Amino acid sequence: MRFYIKTFGCQMNENDSEAMAGLLVKEGFTPASSPEEADVVIINTCAVRRKSEEKAYSELGQVLKLKKKKKIVVGVAGCVAEKEREKFLEKGADFVLGTRAVPRVTEAVKKALEGEKVALFEDHLDEYTHELPRIRTSRHHAWVTIIHGCDRFCTYCIVPYTRGRERSRPMADILEEVKKLAEQGYREVTFLGQNVDAYGKDLKDGSSLAKLLEEASKIEGIERIWFLTSYPTDFSDELIEVIAKNPKVAKSVHLPVQSGSNRILKLMNRRYTKEEYLALLEKIRSKVPEVAISSDIIVGFPTETEEDFMETVDLVEKAQFERLNLAIYSPREGTVAWKYYKDDVPYEEKVRRMQFLMNLQKRINRKLNERYRGKTVRIIVEAQAKNGLFYGRDIRNKIIAFEGEDWMIGRFADVKVEKITAGPLYGKVVWVEKTPSPVSSSE
């Protein structure tokens, strides 16, 4: 039998989908390239924003139409599944899988194939180990979830309610997974967590993200290590030192700020001020001068005034982010903001504010990217884009596109930058590593 998984949302969802695929293949199922070719269709959903949730419902609607034409089993997983639970069974799905029940996907599928309606929401994170099979989407880079859940409870965020409280994987188990990846030819890993900086605190055995990075960097074959996503008040001096001194740890930090207004930050329950955030950036840059810092900002949070917004503009100008992800505030049912704050900023004003910041960030990007003009940069070749060009990232997470060939994927290459934009850079390959490229994409 064949299965198809459609994934929405964050990298952790991608990693969960890789695990579900691995478990199904282990049980004899075969991946399909589209829902039309599949006997089992799983929609792995995201609830972080209203738009992402709407996309998942739209996909479900299309699959349920297909179900009327052919016999298929339909499952819903991810954060919307955790939030809406059995409601999906009422809508026509055959099984629903909670965020901590991913290791039980084959149980759900088998029961659904026998005609049962299945809802699994038990906590099975203890089965989320290095032994869990995965079908990975890259030949050289792997996602590795190191901590599940979040304890921060920002007032706008649904994640603590859908992903649960923080729980770290034992360091030894994570390192076993990384060793296994290195043996299979993987060269890059990204450690994932909703609040990745909190890794180890709940283990109470001295584990920390900084120590994990150090230990993982000792594994032969692993060339680069990334981590996502950081929370400002958990970003330790120890972590900064590791980024500064360890050549395998990426000089790239994603540090969401969400707003530049202290009043709004307090309403968001972000637990820091604009001044404290900027001071943290200064501390990181003083130790890691080459670091690239990116961030997230929400515009139009309840009661956000023009004055609040201009505080955010001021922060963006001072922070000089390499990348900035912008989102329009959308109320998430069940959150504190949804319950207590009126969504009172007009949508048109939210759009205007987002567009203003987008234009500002483009100017900043263009200016920062000028530093690359004429330089030769070492990247790991990732893939071929739709426009036919190949691309890769340097250790600062800068994307560089170039004319290449498929055999280059997964290898180091030196690219001389010839063209600058506000987004990717463009260049010419001057050297490519001659060692064999990794070919395995499954475990």
Curated annotation (Swiss-Prot):
Enzyme Commission (EC) number: 2.8.4.3
SMART domains: Elp3
Lineage top rank: taxon: Bacteria
Domain Radical SAM core residues, every copy: 136-367
Reported impact of residue 157 to A: Decreased iron content and loss of activity
All residue ranges annotated as the MTTase N-terminal domain in the record: 1-114
The protein's role, per its UniProt record: Catalyzes the methylthiolation of N6-(dimethylallyl)adenosine (i(6)A), leading to the formation of 2-methylthio-N6-(dimethylallyl)adenosine (ms(2)i(6)A) at position 37 in tRNAs that read codons beginning with uridine.
Annotated protein name in UniProt: tRNA-2-methylthio-N(6)-dimethylallyladenosine synthase
Species of the source: Thermotoga maritima (strain ATCC 43589 / DSM 3109 / JCM 10099 / NBRC 100826 / MSB8)
Gene name of this polypeptide: miaB
